[in-house]
């Protein structure tokens, strides 16, 4: 196998090449230069200098200028040849025994990054990374090293790497074992990390005759920031080295099937290669074999933060930009896999067309009786008695029996609400509504109709604290499924838990007694008999709490977990007496939801609407609340302008009226603010600038 070394022509350190009997086989020299060179290799002084250096090193062997090839993006490569002796002049090859003396140039680091991106994005069908530690030399702690061992697994055992047609090396082929070593540098610069791939990929072909122009076959593109997302903590053994390990074994095998022969369906093969890369990068099971692992120094953290795309939040009190990657909150798997419908608060509603709207309005205004019903169902405000007459509660029989066992008159406290028992297996309370109108979602009006019983999109689950947490410890999955089966159907689920404070106090007392027992056991022998007597007097409820094995301080954490993972709202209450009052308030909230203007007009619900007695009162209140004008100045403006619209007409015309005493009606700052308010089309423009 041959060896490839990346060198910097600006580094003049002399390095001897020691191989078998003083020869070094298969040396490929990579150089970089500033800017792109379109001329032939013979006209390039850098190529001429390199060829001259090679000629001096090999002695009698001739080195042609064609041995040095210029690729795009200022990357030059010389083909493999046997060299005896030493490189001199201004060309040097790095070795692991003696580091180079001069630092790496910025241009060379940029070219090195381009080469790495070119190898990664090209269609090379090469198996990656041999695990043989003896085959790869040790890496110095003073420089960044990029290792990539490429072993052939094709039956022929050889790869032909065709370069662009202008290259004189198209006719030559070798089998390489790459080890790319850079010049010594402590850290990688930001520009070398974010450099885009080169435009001329190395495409694989089994025969020279199957070569295509490199312009016809472009490498598949993917997210250049993908490698940064897969960054892992650095190994302490390479604390001083910023290295990139490319383990692309499975990926290269797939690419060989895609790019082994270049046939006519090039675009299809490129898409398949892109899918292969994307799946390998995002597959959790293949991270060990199909990933790019980036290791960097701790000093590189500042540089890495610069490369991340920050998310700037306007009007934020945070002084530093927020990384968008850190803000990406991953939902639990059960939430991702299931499509939860949005809650639909408006029942018995549908959109009406303009023709249907005109027909319904004509029908509602046809007779006095229909007109009365039409006005009744479109009232803005509803009384509490009207809301309770519309609502129906279906309570589970087990919950009802539990309430009656506590001698609570549940039906009497919720009158005139209609209560019906249901016999479901879950402790659930459902809400229903007697609808005597249908809502037009397009035009925002109600039409009278026959009475229809509709199901509201809210339900209540009632649990006692101790059995709930006991089931959480023994059958968490079943508890999740029981709660979430309602939220998956578009229901808003509310979990009511009674007896939580009593359970917390009992757990605290039990923990204190356990602590006392442990202390007494360590004091005297008589204490052991006392602890045994206490064990005999232990109650059944305390035994259940011991089996619960939950500390009192963890109860709130479990409630938060239920709220997040089960997608519900948890309301702990003291006892069932409090539950009846709580349910009455909940019925009022659910009942008036259908007539709430913020629900009916959701697209305008963010606006704060205030009403006034008259147009003059509206303008007077506006000047005080929005324009921050005191009462005398507001009254002065209102004496001339009687409405908000009259002032707007004058502002758009470009003038403001004077007062009766021939003095300005308002201050200049207020004029500018009102003119901006009336004429601006930019929602982000400031009204007051001083």
Swiss-Prot record:
Q: Where in the cell is it found?
A: Nucleus
Q: What is its main location?
A: nucleus
**Cellular component GO terms, alphabetically?**
nucleus
- What is the main EC category here? hydrolase
Q: Where is this region: Disordered?
A: 181-216, 521-543
Compositionally biased, Polar residues: which spans? 181-210
Q: Which GO terms describe its biological process?
A: DNA recombination; DNA repair; meiosis I cell cycle process
Q: Which terms are listed as keywords in the entry?
A: DNA damage, DNA recombination, DNA repair, Endonuclease, Hydrolase, Magnesium, Meiosis, Metal-binding, Nuclease, Nucleus
Start-end of Low complexity biased regions: 524-533
Q: Which Pfam families match?
A: ERCC4
Out of the domains of life, which is the source? Answer: Eukaryota
Keyword Nucleus among UniProt keywords: yes
Q: Known EC number(s)? A: 3.1.22.-
What cofactors does this protein use? Mg(2+)
Task: List the signal peptide residues.
Answer: none
Show the SMART domains listed in the entry.
Answer: ERCC4 (SM00891)
Gene Ontology molecular functions: DNA binding; endonuclease activity; metal ion binding
The entry assigns this protein to a family as follows:
Belongs to the EME1/MMS4 family.
Give the quaternary structure.
Interacts with MUS81.
Purpose of the protein: Interacts with MUS81 to form a DNA structure-specific endonuclease with substrate preference for branched DNA structures with a 5'-end at the branch nick. Typical substrates include 3'-flap structures, D-loops, replication forks and nicked Holliday junctions. May be required in mitosis for the processing of stalled or collapsed replication fork intermediates. May be required in meiosis for the repair of meiosis-specific double strand breaks subsequent to single-end invasion (SEI).
> What's the name of the protein?
Crossover junction endonuclease EME1
Q: What is the lineage of its organism?
A: Eukaryota, Fungi, Dikarya, Ascomycota, Saccharomycotina
UniProt gene name = EME1
């Amino acid at each position: 196998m041959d060896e490839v070394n990346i060198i910097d022509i600006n580094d003049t350190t002399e390095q001897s090449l020691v191989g078998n009997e003083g020869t070094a086989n298969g040396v490929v020299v990579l150089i970089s230069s500033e800017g792109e060179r379109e001329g032939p290799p013979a006209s390039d002084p850098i190529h001429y200098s390199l060829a001259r250096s090679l000629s001096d090193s090999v002695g009698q062997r001739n080195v042609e200028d064609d041995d040095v090839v210029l690729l795009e993006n200022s990357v030059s490569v010389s083909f493999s040849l046997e060299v005896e002796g030493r490189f001199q002049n201004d060309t040097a090859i790095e070795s692991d025994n003696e580091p180079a003396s001069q630092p790496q140039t910025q241009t060379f680091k940029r070219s090195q990054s381009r080469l790495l991106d070119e190898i990664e994005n090209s269609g090379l069908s090469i198996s990656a990374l041999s695990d043989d530690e003896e085959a790869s030399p040790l890496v110095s702690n003073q420089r960044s090293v990029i290792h990539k061992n490429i072993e052939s697994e094709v039956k022929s055992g050889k790869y032909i790497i065709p370069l662009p047609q202008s290259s004189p090396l198209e006719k030559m082929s070798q089998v390489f074992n790459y080890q790319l070593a850079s010049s010594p540098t402590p850290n990688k610069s930001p520009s070398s990390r974010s450099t885009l791939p080169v435009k001329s990929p190395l495409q694989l072909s089994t025969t020279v005759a199957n070569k295509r122009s490199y312009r016809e076959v472009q490498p598949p593109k993917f997210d250049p920031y993908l490698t940064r997302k897969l960054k892992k903590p650095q190994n302490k053994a390479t604390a001083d080295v910023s290295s990139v390990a490319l383990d692309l074994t499975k990926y290269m095998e797939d690419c060989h099937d895609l790019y082994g022969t270049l046939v006519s369906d090039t675009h299809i093969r490129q898409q398949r290669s892109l899918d292969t890369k994307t799946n390998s990068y995002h597959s959790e099971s293949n991270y060990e074999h199909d990933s790019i692992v980036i290791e960097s120094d701790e000093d590189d953290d500042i540089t890495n933060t610069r490369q991340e795309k920050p998310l700037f939040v306007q009007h934020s009190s945070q002084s530093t930009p927020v990384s968008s990657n850190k803000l990406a909150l991953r939902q639990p798997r059960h939430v991702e896999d299931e499509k939860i419908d949005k809650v639909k608060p408006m029942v018995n509603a549908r959109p009406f067309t303009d023709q249907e709207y005109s027909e319904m309005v004509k029908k509602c205004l046809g007779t006095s009786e229909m007109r009365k019903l039409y006005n009744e169902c479109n009232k803005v405000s509803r009384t509490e008695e009207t809301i309770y007459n519309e609502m129906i509660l279906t309570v589970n029989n087990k919950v009802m029996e539990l309430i009656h066992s506590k001698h609570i008159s549940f039906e009497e406290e919720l009158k005139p609400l209609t209560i019906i028992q249901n016999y479901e297996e879950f402790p659930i309370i459902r809400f229903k509504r007697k609808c005597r109108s249908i809502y037009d979602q397009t035009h925002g009006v109600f039409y009278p109709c026959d009475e229809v019983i509709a199901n509201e999109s809210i339900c209540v689950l009632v649990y006692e604290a101790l059995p709930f947490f006991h089931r959480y410890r023994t059958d968490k999955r079943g508890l999740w499924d029981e709660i979430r089966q309602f939220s998956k159907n578009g229901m808003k689920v509310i979990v009511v838990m009674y007896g939580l404070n009593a359970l917390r106090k009992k757990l605290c007392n039990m923990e204190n007694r356990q602590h006392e027992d442990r202390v007494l056991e360590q004091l005297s022998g008589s204490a052991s008999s006392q602890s045994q007597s206490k064990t005999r007097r232990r109650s059944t409820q305390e035994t259940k709490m011991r089996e619960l094995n939950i500390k009192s301080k963890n109860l709130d954490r479990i409630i938060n977990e239920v709220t997040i993972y089960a997608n519900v709202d948890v309301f702990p209450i003291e006892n069932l007496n409090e539950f009846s009052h709580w349910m009455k308030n909940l019925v009022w909230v659910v009942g008036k939801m259908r007539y709430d203007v913020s629900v009916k007009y959701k697209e305008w619900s963010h606006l704060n609407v205030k009403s006034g007695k008259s147009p003059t009162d509206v303008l007077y209140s506006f000047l005080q609340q929005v324009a921050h004008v005191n009462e005398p100045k507001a009254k002065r403006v209102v004496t001339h302008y009687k409405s908000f619209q009259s002032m707007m007409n004058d502002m758009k015309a470009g003038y403001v009226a004077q007062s009766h005493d021939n003095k300005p009606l308002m201050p200049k700052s207020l004029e500018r603010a009102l003119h901006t308010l009336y004429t601006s089309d930019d929602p982000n423009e400031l009204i007051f600038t001083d």
